[in-house]
Amino acid sequence: MRILCTNDDGIHAPGLKTVEQIARAISDDVWVVAPELDQSGVSHSLSLNDPLRLREVGPRHFAVRGTPTDCVIMGSRFILKDKAPDLVLSGVNRGRNVAEDVVYSGTIAGALEGTILGLPSFALSQEFTIETRNAPLWETARTHAPDIIRKVMAAGVPKNTVVNINFPACTPDKVKGVVVTRQGKRNPGFLRIDERHDGRGNPYYWIGFERIKVEDMPAEGTDLAALAANFVSVTPLKLDRTDETFSAALANTLA
């Protein structure tokens, strides 16, 4: 099985080394094509106004000056054009990709692009806490991911579906199990703007995120709830985002 690995944290990110280890636990034919620089939060963007630069940084390891989407396209349609990958693994992201993260995440986008190209694709993310922020517990993803991926691949991944896997912020032995979840939803106030000032007194701004409060505990059955209870969350995400229920109602409204 030929596996293409990518991420959004960049070619030198520790999570990329982790996803490569996960891939090598499944196959010996592993290729890494990842962004030259950190591309967190770029979602599914394509580089259409700038040329892509490709640099070989080691055997079967390539850095692309572009987005995760660019990397999957370069990997599958150029670097591996003679024999396409059988599987795309995107991650392991530093931090979870759940709820609304799904629409912002470059990690998810890398897997989505693989799906668009007709390849079974998984997005992998490792949650961290305030205490583990600077040293996420990569061993949790490394320990549990290979078995999950093997089982899902054996069952078969439907076309136009991405498998989004999030690992809780606990050691491997503390993981309570694996659950299939639905995409959760946060309180709309989870985004914030931080205003700061440079040395000349000019303002600049950072987009930030509020942590979930106790009173905002997530709904049961969601990716958020699974991680909070130390379960691995496995969420199938469809490429087709059509709201079928509203479509039917809208058709009657506009008839």
From Swiss-Prot:
Give the cofactor binding note: Binds 1 divalent metal cation per subunit.
Enzyme nomenclature, EC number? 3.1.3.5
Q: Where does a divalent metal cation bind?
A: 8-9, 40, 93
Q: Which reaction does it catalyse?
A: a ribonucleoside 5'-phosphate + H2O = a ribonucleoside + phosphate
Q: Transmembrane region positions?
A: none
Keyword Cell membrane listed: no
Known cofactor(s): a divalent metal cation
Recorded GO molecular functions are: 3'-nucleotidase activity; 5'-nucleotidase activity; exopolyphosphatase activity; metal ion binding; nucleotide binding
Q: Which family does it belong to?
A: Belongs to the SurE nucleotidase family.
The function of this protein is:
Nucleotidase that shows phosphatase activity on nucleoside 5'-monophosphates.
Protein name, UniProt field: 5'-nucleotidase SurE
Organism of origin is Rhodopseudomonas palustris (strain TIE-1)
